[in-house]
Amino acid sequence: LGNQKRMNYALRPDMTQVEFIQEVTDGLMPPPPYFPINVKLNKEGGYADIDEVLNQGLRSLSPAEFEAAADEVSALVLDVRSPEEFAVGHVPNSIFIGLDGNFAPWVGELIVDVQQPILLVVSEGREEEAVTRLARVGFDRTLGFLKGGTEAWINAGMSTETVNSISAEQFEAEHSSNQDRIFDVRKQGEHRSEHLEGAHHTPLSALNDHLAEFPAVEPFYLHCAGGYRSMIASSMLKARGIHNMVDVQGGFTAISETKIPRTSYVCPSTL
């Protein structure tokens, strides 16, 4: 406790209550839209029975059934595989939020309506995990998953889309002529701590508020910290008709190993 009093920026003895509140809340994002809804459900009840949720969500759908279900109820196609798999090929207009990342927080942040019908593209063997993790944050209207995944989708003659994804080394080679078309989708604190010189800061959580800022024709580059959030951003932009993005694999972590100019590092705790 004594060490905390000496070192913790928010425990200075000369701080007023107003200053303390400012320190500990600076940079905090608003709570995800599902938070107040889940609070209400926790207080009043109303969660769907988990067995019913699983029975519905674990329906395996052929490509034709999957497409028909999506059209019938305007279901959101949610791809929960890896960023690399999504980049290689995905169902058009699907949104990527991978299970191997901050899945539940980003689902709650980006899918506003907990009553949104959802169809899953998921790796074999992880179907129940996906349905369960969605239900835990209030999204209990999963209607099923694509049987056989994208391979079955392609074999059925359905079209797929891809994301142009390049290595940090390739990005370094292209950087000098594209410095004004780089978009950093990390959080404010990450960006303020260190970023690429000249990069636009467009947090993933606020992406929909910045659609007009992305070039209409020329390629532009997206990066986050490690490649997870930038692929989410790519999927969201593609679903809104913007397809000229280039995703940087490995994000800022990989870019930091190149010679691309960056701002001086500032410890986040001092911001």
Kindly give the residue locations of the regions a language model identified.
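Rhodanese-like catalytic fold shared by cysteine-dependent sulfurtransferases
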Residues: 2-46, 51-55, 72-74, 83-271
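Phosphate-rich cofactor/ligand-interacting catalytic cores and adjacent structured alpha/beta frameworks
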Residues: 79
